[in-house]
Amino acid sequence: MNFSVLPPEINSALMFAGAGPGPMLAAASAWTGLAGDLGSAAASFSAVTSQLATGSWQGPASAAMTGVAASYARWLTTAAAQAEQAAGQAQAAVSAFEAALAATVHPGAVSANRGRLRSLVASNLLGQNAPAIAAVEAVYEQMWAADVAAMLGYHGEASAVALSLTPFTPSPSAAATPGGAVIIAGFPFLDLGNVTIGGFNLASGNLGLGNLGSFNPGSANTGSVNLGNANIGDLNLGSGNIGSYNLGGGNTGDLNPGSGNTGTLNWGSGNIGSYNLGGGNLGSYNLGSGNTGDTNFGGGNTGNLNVGGGNTGNSNFGFGNTGNVNFGNGNTGDTNFGSGNLGSGNIGFGNKGSHNIGFGNSGNNNIGFGLTGDNQIGFGALNSGSGNLGFGNSGNGNIGFFNSGNNNIGMGNSGNGVGALSVEFGSSAERSSGFGNSGELSTGIGNSGQLSTGWFNSATTSTGWFNSGTTNTGWFNSGTTNTGIGNSGGNLVTGSMGLFNSGHTNTGSFNAGSMNTGDFNSGNVNTGYFNSGNINTGFFNSGDLNTGLFNSVNQPVQNSGWLHTGTNNSGYANAGTFNSGFDNNARDEHAEFVTGNSGLANVGNYNAGIINVGDHLSGFRNSVPTITGTANISGFVNAGTSISGFFNFGSLMSGFANFDDEVSGYLNGDSRASGWIH
């Protein structure tokens, strides 16, 4: 990692976050105790065998025993010395960390510096703060340099500590175990039918079991120094990650404090991208949730540099704008200052045209309100449109204020409304219901995606809050066709049913791998928990095709589990290929591709959940009317195509109990409707 390119906000946060030196001090103490125990055992064992050999036990058997015992005593003595060295190096690592921590700028000081800069910039109307701004920036550069020096020093000392460690010498009995592995904790390599319980690691210094790597306190990791389980990578504190330095679970990437992220350094869950503070973002540098784009401050925006929610475009400040550089709500166009304007360059509310100053003008370059035409100054009717009830409406058939669209019930809308039983405020979308929506046919608040039901969704046909992926049911999902919370997988095939999955087609939670049934799996097609290998049935397996626990070897079989018809299945009684779970059936019409299901009793391809029929479904009891074909459904008990939510029948739908096509909301029976009971 190149620490010199990371600002002090990141370097300081990385140093001050986490458990500190406590775990390493505990490890040093444990290694010291182990060294003492091994030394005592070596001395005691040598004394006992010497007394036997020089006493009553004589002959060839005694001589053979003496040779074996001497070899074992030497190994105990060597292991004691190596444990003592490990304790010393752990203490050296603690000293290196404490020195680096003392040299690192506190995050509070960095935050105060940036806050001071923002204050100076905001009040620098005449340039009077230029010297102070330069001074603040100079201090910030010093902070940057101090953090870089601390991190580089820490990296150098920690690397030296790691290089000086000597791998543990295998015990004299290691040659009798598979692959020369060292059996720890007294586990033999048991064989119970097709169930194996492996108790060994394929490297040294592990406290857990079934690891392919070194110095893992956890189990079933492929990598080194993982405190959690089933990680593929190094130095993960959580479980089920593919990557390194993750604090949460189910991430694909590095340095994520949250869970279910695909990317780097996301402070939140379910993001696809990097440096997001929030959840369910599809992009980078977002401070908020459910955004599609970069550097947004808020939720449900599609675009970049927006402050607010539900905007489609760039650099908007407000809600529900379609366009760029708008300050206000529900504007369609660019550079409007106000709300409900249909056009560009307006200052005011409800103007239908461009470059107007005032309210409810129909035309261009007007100053006033209620004017019809261009280049006028003055006051016209209360409403410049027809069939309006209210004030400042330039559209037609509105009930309310400052609407430039038609048939709205509400205020400040530039899009066209749905009609009775739907209320719109600050929306620029066609036929949407709610507040601040720029997505067509949406129901809720701040949706920039079309046909969405909920709050701050930036993708189409989603039901829930802060979803930036398409056809999700739940919260903070940036992937596609997920049912749950914080899932970033599924963009190429099907999403997952569960929580914080960055892989696709999982039934469970915190899976960075794909097509798993269970939790915290970083491998693929596993049924169980904490597996970093592939096609395993069980727990803590880092090898492939194992049925059991703590296995780090690859088995020469076609399936793991029991009673399968096909190949590469895990679990129980699956038919087809690449299924995990129980009683799933993957049709072979696309056999040249990787097909399969996770969960229980699914029929089709790429399904995650329970009793789904069709292709590309997640959730519970979803289906397509023709039994076969791609459905793209998430949620519960839906039938049709491209649906999220609950109890819907049709296509392109979100919400609850809708019956027809292109619908969002609740209990609607008409097509192209949003809201309630149309």
Curated annotation (Swiss-Prot):
GO terms for biological process: response to host immune response. Its main location: membrane. Keywords: Cell membrane, Membrane, Transmembrane, Transmembrane helix. It is a multi-pass membrane protein. InterPro entries: Mycobac_pentapep (IPR002989), PPE_dom (IPR000030), PPE_sf (IPR038332). GO terms for cellular component: plasma membrane. It comes from the Bacteria. Signal peptide: none annotated. The chain crosses the membrane at residues 14-34, 180-200. It is found in: Cell membrane. Belongs to the mycobacterial PPE family. This is Uncharacterized PPE family protein PPE21. The gene is PPE21.
